Amino acid sequence: LPFTYPPFAALVFLPFAFLPLEVGKAIMVLGTTAAAWWLSATIYNYAQTSGRALPLQGRLGRTGTIAVLTIVVMLCGPWRRTFHLMQINPLIMALILADFVRPATRVPRGVLVGIAGGLKLTPLVFGLILLVRRDWKGIAALVATFLATIAIGFILLPNEAPQFWFSAI
């Protein structure tokens, strides 16, 4: 796809247009770092609940292990590149991971993946997980949420949305 960011993404990040560039960068760096910390905490919690000890966990404790994991995540090439380009991929990854690891609630799985798909088209591939699981409610939630992001784009960006959906992709 030549352009994978739908109009909904522009709406979500519109507030950044009113901020000084350095403030926007600082917010993105803090958000990306928070996403790395949350990912690391999620990995730690998964290891705990599955009975798998992480290296150095005994010496570092919970906070130390999560801090080391966060550093490792942030040193990975894709994450470093995200800092350089100020991309939204950590936010998208956090939405997808949160959708699949959160406890079951009245809100079906798929909602957060649908929002992530509204920000960038590629996360929609995670709908295949719901399909393999035969989670029809989750698939319906994903599709409905994604369609809602498209509708919001058409309502609030009536010139740009048709251009994106009918020309850019």
Question: What is each model feature region?
Answer:
Residues L1-R109, R133-I169:
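Primarily membrane-embedded glycan-assembly and transfer machineries that use lipid-linked glycans
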Residues P108-L131:
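Membrane-interface alpha helices of multi-pass inner-membrane proteins
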